[in-house]
Amino acid sequence: MGRCDGRCTLVVICCLQLVAALQRQVFDFMGYQWAPILANFLHIMAVILGVFGTVQVRSRYLILYAVWLVVWVGWNSFIICFYLEVGHLSQDRDFLMTFNTSLHRSWWMENGPGCLVTPVPDSPLAPQDHHVITVSGCLLDYQYIEVVSSALQVFLALFGFVYACYVSKYSPDDEDSFDFFDGLGSYNYQPPQKISQLQLRPLYTTG
């Protein structure tokens, strides 16, 4: 019963991770944040693998899922430090989130709750084919929204890691022993028995 509860809980956690990752992917696409987009895609694939491993009780898939969650926690910790400008990290350095291919920032920078965007015409600071804007009146600055989003990812990943380790501990080591159809699919191959050779006897005919 406890094993079933653990599997069901892990499936729920994976579903929450998928919802959070897809929501984050949408906003990262709108903000042209290519590095987070790539990371989110890998995370979605890993979570799907985790769901598959949980439903079919495949310990190898659960271990891969747990290993990815460690990487995912590290990535989101970096995002938190990046937006809070911890240490030498700066939001104005090299545009890390866009692979230095554009000047776009987080979508929440201009579209946060209560934000008022005002364009600055003919600004000498504007690069070619770009314009300068000022953002004011935000109820919550965009960097804190990104930090909260990453913190949620870390929170779900920690729970997912614990339950993945728990479920994989009680998973069968031999993956071939798993029966998808609850016993109906098991098939033991038996080679056909050799048919005894017929004894040939001469046939005599009378003329």
Curated annotation (Swiss-Prot):
It is found in: Cell membrane. GO terms for cellular component: plasma membrane. Pfam families: NKAIN. It is a multi-pass membrane protein. InterPro entries: Na/K-Atpase_Interacting. Keywords: Cell membrane, Glycoprotein, Membrane, Transmembrane, Transmembrane helix. Glycans are attached at residue 100. Its main location: membrane. One of its GO terms (biological process) is regulation of sodium ion transport. The chain crosses the membrane at residues 2-22, 35-55, 62-82, 147-167. Belongs to the NKAIN family. Interacts with atp1b1 C-terminus. PANTHER family: SODIUM_POTASSIUM-TRANSPORTING ATPASE SUBUNIT BETA-1-INTERACTING PROTEIN 1 (PTHR13084:SF4), T-CELL LYMPHOMA BREAKPOINT-ASSOCIATED TARGET 1-RELATED (PTHR13084). This is Sodium/potassium-transporting ATPase subunit beta-1-interacting protein 1. It comes from Danio rerio (Zebrafish). The gene is nkain1.
